[in-house]
Amino acid sequence: MKKFFAIAAAAVVLAACSGDRDHILKVYNWSDYIDESVIPEFEAWYEEQTGEPVKVIYQTFDINETMLSKIEKGHEDYDVVCPSDYIIERMLKSDLLLPLDRDFGSTPNYIDDNLSPYIRDCFNKIEGGGKNANDYSVGYMWGTTGILYNAKYVTDEEVSTWDVLRNPKFADKIFIKDSARDVFSQIIIYLHREDLAAGKVTLDELMLDSSDEAIAEVENFMKQVKPLVAGWEADFGKDQMTQERGWLSLNWSGDGVWAIEEAAEVGVDLRYSLPREGFTVWFDGWVIPKFAVNTKAAKYWINFMSRPDIVIRNVEVTGYVSVSGAPEVLEAFTDEEYDAIDLSYFFGAEADSVCVNPVLYPDRADIERSAQEHDWGERTPYLVAMWSRVKGESASGMTMIVVAVFIVALAAFGIYTKFFKNRKKARKRR
């Protein structure tokens, strides 16, 4: 219903302003991925900086491919959108993006002043068909893929390896992200752990391997995991973990932070592990599509979203981690509750021993075992087909029970204050 009214309101504004499109900024972002109070602040700030009025039309999506289809096939005139890393890669190769003009006149360039050098290097690795992704996109949020686990039932040693996913000890207590891309990447790393250790292959090479052999390897492993799986989930897995219906969950760090906090309130000890064999990092970033109309307001929007105070507010609301390496951001999330870790790779040399939640920001020693995923391009259908074979045509009885229990629980909670204290809802990132 909320989404319906948002779309209706946007339609009314667009109709009223159809003759003034140059003063409208159409933003297309993930659901629940921003502190929405910053939107009117941007409108006022933009007029202060440029002397021109602007009205933001803010719309949301839940699946990368939905957004991409609207732009690639429908030629929708969104001015700024926020796709994931592999979609940025695909859009670059398809010539769907405009280069980002970083000239803001007398307005500070918050983008280049605050972007973490680690994130800049990662965007340099995006396969853009000869184009540098840093010239066409600016990071927004980032995170890792790891294992969320219940320390009451699973030891730190057991969860230090991806092989824990096929441990029969945890039958019917394992939840797996319904994301072929993320699952494939973690498992191919595990399966080639010895080659990695021997220097016969690199993480980057594994992330670019979409061969039939690689697909078959992962499929074989996951078919061993399948009998132990309680559910293939897009979003409900973290809730099952907080309620102790699940003990292990292949999950994203943002969901991990959310689940750990919620579980602690009811006395459940959830933790997050980055297995020793390696893991992947992911990114979402702002881009200006080729069919954009108000490119000036679009670049100012990206600049505004890179301002440290706005960054902090968005992180606090969404639970995800910004790409900003600004000292104000580090200060905001420093917490003496945590042991000191080395974040010099992200915030600079002075951050070599800081007390920050390691689920939000991995230690340098961990990040050195990380890999960056890429778009599969024409090989994507083969990945999707493998995933369908792994899951099978129908859901297991346990999966159906879990879904039913989840739905009943939501109803009983009365959507629990805008669904668990206004924290993020389903975000089918991949």
Residue ranges and their predicted role:
Residues 18-94, 395-400:
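Early extracytoplasmic/lumenal segment of secretory-pathway proteins
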Residues 108-110, 216-223, 266-290:
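Periplasmic-binding protein-like
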